[in-house]
Amino acid sequence: MDKSKIRNFSIIAHIDHGKSTLADRILELTNTVEKREMQDQLLDSMDIERERGITIKLNSVQLKYHSKDNQDYIFNLIDTPGHVDFTYEVSRSLAACEGAILVVDASQGVEAQTLANVYLAIDSNLEIIPVINKIDLPSADVDKVKHEIEEIIGLDCSKSPLISAKTGLNVEDVLQAIVEKIPSPSDAIDNAPLKALIFDSYYDKYLGVVMSIRLKQGMLKVGDKIKLMSTNAEYEVTSLGIKTPKIVKKDFLEAGEVGWVAASIKTIKDVNVGDTITSVLNPADEPLDGYKKLKPMVYCGIYPIDTNKYQDFKEALEKIELSDSSLVYEPETSQALGFGFRCGFLGLLHMEVIQERLEREYNLELIATAPSVVYKVHLTNKQVIELDNPALLPEAQKISKIEEPFVEIKIATPSEYIGDLMNLCQNKLGIYKNMEVIDNNRRILIYQMPLAEIIFDFFNKLKSISKGYASFEYELIGYKESKLVRMDIKLNGEMVDAFSMIVNQKFAYQRGSALTLKLKELIPRQNFEVPVQATIGNKVISRETIKAYRKDVTWKLHAADKSRRKKLLEKQKEGKIKMKEIGTVEVPQEAFVAILKIDD
């Protein structure tokens, strides 16, 4: 194979800037997919991806392109997720490429996530082609967007293709730019020791785990003995090939190619994205750079509403885990919610997507507790424990300090919302770092703040303040000590473990008051009075009372029969005291959802 005719590239963009639509047009123009098989967002395989208009799972496809210089080229398009939760996957798929197409919406301009992904591409030394999309919109301002890209990112836009991916206008210019500007895989050597980067994996019920790979050097054939360098696990290649986007089997793959390989691997946990495949007989000395083990950043408890569906829920998690190695879970029991699982996710979007897939694809009705981050708890006996479940936090006297994860957040916003967004960040314990100018009307705010404050309703407030115009991205910068306490909720004197949360001391009173008030509204009245208390240790910081129903036991008495009336009321009072001692309070599902929505 002539390596000079190969082009490996990704498309990067902010959500809704037209990445998947451009991919569709490229598939059409190169006749990769027949017109009758074409559908919108073809590379987005899940219904959730199409409905939300986002890419979650990576996809790759090989295309053939006949260029203007009468040459035939092979393009490998590696589709990438655009959301901050999946940054590591984006970085690995970019590492499989030599170039990237940066798609920017002509009416929106440069957004926070655009910057995040561009910097990843720059870190991978990729050739970046800026493409300005949606030029057919009435609100498009091409010159302004060109200026933004040149000023903020430093890319020359004088020859940028100006396109409409929706109508197909000028998309041919993008294909020609790929040929002219993106380099071929020049370092690809066939006779060197095998090195292949795993940039994605999924489970197939016939083949087992299928790994999406980019061969950096060496060759790979069916029957070869291979080794995964992070675990030293050895396997035999059973089949390999390329995607067009259909699965096409081949006998071998060469250096510089992008394809897939299966080796009878049973579970996806055995394969790590970013790992290097090498040969058992002639192994490489060093793995490829950039591999790291992914750790969940956000945890929550998920429980089936119907307790009889526990086994179905467990099987559904096992099936989803086959195609998503970043999901972690372990069994958990709650006094309030019964049997369920403590699940770990890469971020809030990842959590929502997994929950939605469980409910949709497996017909389950689920309830989730408030999300929590991983805290580092330093005990007085010098031990350090990592904790993601607030209910398991030790007593205050055993703790010397608690550290929580901090992130650096970049918010791209129109200038008019800056004051309100700065207030929001300060209310979320943000530390101001910098403000960068995009143009006359847009700025980038840079803050450092606790991750726990971002997962707690930050996104909704940001969108509400900016009327949807602001966008943000964040990255973990490490752990810092904070004044944190565990707040519990007691109903009728009994602690409800599913309501426990770790909060900053500064917010404990407001959140306690807001939550007790919300629960008072949502929990139905009982036949006895129910106190709703927010507590820190033994101290009650907020209390509301759900009044009892008052049954009129005296309705059939004569007005003059005062002693009988008094006797009946005393009896009712005794009954209520007894009922309160043995009575349990039914908590409706809405109450568990309310904990996610309480306002500061």
Curated annotation (Swiss-Prot):
Any one GO BP annotation for this protein: positive regulation of translation
Location in the cell:
Cell membrane
Q: Does the keyword Cell membrane apply?
A: yes
Instruction: Identify the enzyme class.
Output: hydrolase
Which InterPro entries does this chain map to?
Answer: EF-4, EFG_III/V, EFG_V-like, EFTu-like_2, G_TR_CS, LepA_C_sf, LepA_CTD, LepA_IV
What gene is this protein a product of?
lepA
What the protein does comes down to: Required for accurate and efficient protein synthesis under certain stress conditions. May act as a fidelity factor of the translation reaction, by catalyzing a one-codon backward translocation of tRNAs on improperly translocated ribosomes. Back-translocation proceeds from a post-translocation (POST) complex to a pre-translocation (PRE) complex, thus giving elongation factor G a second chance to translocate the tRNAs correctly. Binds to ribosomes in a GTP-dependent manner.
Keyword Ligase included in the entry's annotation: no
| Annotated residues for binding of GTP | D16, H17, G18, K19, S20, T21, N133, K134, I135, D136
> What EC number(s) is this enzyme filed under?
3.6.5.n1
Q: Name one GO cellular component term.
A: plasma membrane
Q: What is this protein called?
A: Elongation factor 4
Task: Please list the residue ranges annotated as the tr-type G domain.
Answer: 4-186
Among PROSITE patterns, the record links this protein to: G_TR_1, G_TR_2
Homology family: Belongs to the TRAFAC class translation factor GTPase superfamily. Classic translation factor GTPase family. LepA subfamily.
